[in-house]
Amino acid sequence: MTTIESKEEQAVGQDIAVTIVDTDVHPLPVSPEVLRSYAPAEWKDKLWPTGNAVSPVPHFYDTPDSYKTMSLRVDAAPPGGGVAGSDPDFAAKQLLVDAGVSIALLEPMCDAQLPHAEHVLKGTYNDWLANVWLGENNWHGRWRGALSVTAQDPELAAREIERWAGHPYMAEVLMTPQTRGIPFGSPHFDPMYEAAARHGLPVATHLMGQTPFELIPIYPVGNPAHWHDFFASWPLLYVSHLMSLVFDGAFDRHPELRVVFVEGGFTWAMPVMWRMDRIWEQRKADLPHVRRKPSEYVREHVRFTTQPLEEVDVGTYRRYIEMMDLGGNLMFSTDYPHWSYDSPDWAIKRFPPDQRERIMRGNATALYRLPSTVKALPGEHGDVAV
């Protein structure tokens, strides 16, 4: 494994072409105390009353060592100590140098039950992310951050967006899909959508949580008992939100809004688009505000990250992508440093050759307005930009 030199010895290399953009990476704090140091004084003990920022025991069966690893790759733990995903330089060594990722989007996982508590917690994470990952540890300029906001109070979310608008490395807004019964297309979210669209920031959603009751959504038949139940059911949330975004008119109210569904895969989107198109054709009189086919809204406004990829052959993926013309809507992701990580070398072979460039790089580069070249890290061998 290649070693990145200390900051004092780092020399930024030549320009190399951006070939892989990872749209789902999870940075973690070294300890709860680190986060506490960024929280307002009156909230420190309220947010971490026991000194633990994560649930101390697994709340459904995950992996055999989930209690010890928090579902993280054991080999991603920094040699100097700490949990996987807590050391920016070691993450850069594994993800940027060894795995060949050119630019990675960092999405912290944090949530809270009460609206104002959630707002404060998200703001705390934003301050930590900006300082620890997007500050001096982003000397290479290859980390991008997700700006976390509360879904429960969109006015506070809009305020947080305004606080970070213009930051050179904050690339998107991040919210939970666990919205307590309010679908994404509801006007409830309009203040947040308006602020995000005005500043050209896509709104991403990723399941998250601080406690067992927040992490696991309640499905029609109750809570999942095992990790595979949970993971297979995850897209159910996204199906509901996607239909609401289209049928409840969010994209008509906010023509510049872009939404990213993270870590739910994408194969579920095709049958949903078919069904929405059929309903729209049959019941246009009931949907006068939906001016185009629902599938057209999806192609223009929605992106899906690829992880977790189903292990099917290239021909199957080609048929899926071509059926609803979704090649321009998929963005590669690894889910580093979780054990469910999809490596770039493995994933790229699943995509049709003529779709690989835009899935691995092009779609994300366009959405997040990323550069076409980056500076090579020590030990990295990329395609030299000309």
Residue ranges and their predicted role:
Residues 3, 134-137, 142-143, 149, ...:
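Catalytic pocket-lining loop regions of alpha/beta-barrel enzymes
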Residues 73-81, 93-115, 142-148, 171-175:
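Divalent metal-dependent hydrolysis catalytic cores, especially in the metallo-beta-lactamase
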Residues 25, 101, 107-110, 148, ...:
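Short, well-ordered beta-to-alpha junction loops that form the rim of enzyme active sites
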Residues 2-21, 29-98, 102, 127, ...:
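Mid-to-C-terminal alpha-helical segments outside catalytic/metal-binding sites
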Residues 117-119:
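Internal helix-loop-helix
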Residues 110-114, 180, 339, 344:
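A short, flexible beta-alpha/helix-coil linker loop
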Residues 31-33, 109, 215, 261, ...:
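Hydrophobic alpha-helical membrane-insertion segments
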